[in-house]
């Protein structure tokens, strides 16, 4: 089961073990009293959370010294839990499902999605270009806006994304 990074713990706040919570997910509602997360330093169960202040307190961590041991620790969920807890609508996808998909246009493989970059204008797929295009001196990677005008179809069962206009972006890169 693959771990998904959902948050990073920051500095301590106050005297009772509260910590800054830096949320790294599109689903902040998962941070509720009683929720348990794995961290790179052990399991942590939320005792309280204050979204307005961006802080969290965990059960059994009641002092600044105890909390400092978790500064910069990452909190993890997993794909299965995320899919169960947060059902998506039509034409909505989890990033972890999109990563690793092959990108095609008119039957030609353009490359593979290796990352998703969130930019002010929207989400972009970072595509590692197929060797056949790199051999023709094209860019080793390029960005495709995740918009209807470029994305024709997403076939998660085949790990395949069909595009239109993406080859033009590659050619211009």
Curated annotation (Swiss-Prot):
Main subcellular location: cytoplasm
Residues annotated as domain PRC barrel: 90-169
GO cellular component labels: cytoplasm; ribosome
Coiled coil: none
Record localization: Cytoplasm
Gene Ontology MF terms in the entry: ribosome binding
Key words of the record: Chaperone, Cytoplasm, Ribosome biogenesis, rRNA processing
GO aspect biological process, one term: rRNA processing
Database matches in SUPFAM superfamilies: PRC-barrel domain, Translation proteins
Range of residues in the leader sequence: none
Pfam families for this protein: PRC_RimM, RimM
NCBIfam families, per database record: 16S_RimM
Functional summary from the UniProt entry: An accessory protein needed during the final step in the assembly of 30S ribosomal subunit, possibly for assembly of the head region. Essential for efficient processing of 16S rRNA. May be needed both before and after RbfA during the maturation of 16S rRNA. It has affinity for free ribosomal 30S subunits but not for 70S ribosomes.
Family membership: Belongs to the RimM family.
Subunit structure as annotated in this protein's UniProt entry: Binds ribosomal protein uS19.
Domain note: The PRC barrel domain binds ribosomal protein uS19.
Entry protein name: Ribosome maturation factor RimM
Organism of origin: Nitratiruptor sp. (strain SB155-2)
């Amino acid at each position: 089961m693959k771990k998904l990074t959902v948050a990073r713990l920051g500095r301590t706040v106050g005297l009772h073990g509260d910590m800054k919570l830096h949320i790294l997910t599109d689903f902040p509602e998962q941070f509720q009293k009683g929720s348990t997360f794995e961290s790179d330093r052990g399991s942590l169960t939320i005792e309280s959370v204050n979204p307005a202040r961006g802080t969290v307190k965990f059960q059994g961590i009641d002092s600044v010294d105890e909390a400092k041991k978790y500064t910069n620790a990452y909190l993890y969920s997993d794909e299965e839990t995320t899919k169960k807890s947060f059902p998506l609508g039509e034409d909505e996808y989890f990033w972890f499902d999109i990563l690793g998909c092959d990108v095609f246009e008119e039957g030609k493989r353009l490359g593979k999605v290796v990352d998703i970059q969130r930019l002010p204008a929207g989400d972009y797929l970072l595509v590692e270009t197929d060797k056949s295009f790199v051999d023709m001196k094209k860019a080793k990677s390029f960005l495709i806006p995740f918009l209807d005008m470029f994305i024709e179809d997403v076939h998660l069962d085949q790990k395949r994304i069909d595009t239109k206009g993406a080859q033009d972006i590659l050619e211009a890169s």
